[in-house]
Amino acid sequence: METYPITIGKITRHVPVVETLPGVHIPLVEIMGDVDLVQAAAEGLLKHLPPETDALLTLETSPIVLAHSISALCGKPYVVVRRKRRPYMQDPIIQEVESLTLGVSETLWLDSRMAEKLMGQNVALVFDVVSSGGTMTALEKVAKKAGANVVARLAAFHQGNSKLPVTFLSEIPILQTA
């Protein structure tokens, strides 16, 4: 199996290269379960967290561990936006997003009770990997609908040509094959 080296701080991993679309391969970064990599990313991103940040905003599933680790380091709360509607949700904020990297459209959901926690807050968006920027753009729209002000866009890894200004720790390629 072909692998690609990724590094955050002093932590290096060799991750598998997978095909996402015909002729397009990416290093598959899955941070869940890798405590050392998550901790290194949290420590690295914490250095870029603006002092005016009140809360972190992330989405399920993979970036939760990163947001949790940053939260534990800085004492700021975090809110998780869901990728599926949950039965308990009341009057949720709904935002469509298309992930160009994986070619799959999805919907983001934020329960109104969670949205209330963001009202008037300065939030930092936390991601594991940002590629096209489509999902992060949708998350920013959720934050604004909830009445929050986005003060930072943070990601452990950046991949591709996102036009968004994102603070990231490491770059990973999109590999094209003929």
Briefly describe each language-model feature range.
Residues 1-53:
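Active-site-facing substrate-recognition patch
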Residues 5, 137-178:
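PRPP-dependent phosphoribosyltransferase catalytic core
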Residues 53-60:
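Short glycine-rich phosphate-binding loop at a beta-alpha junction
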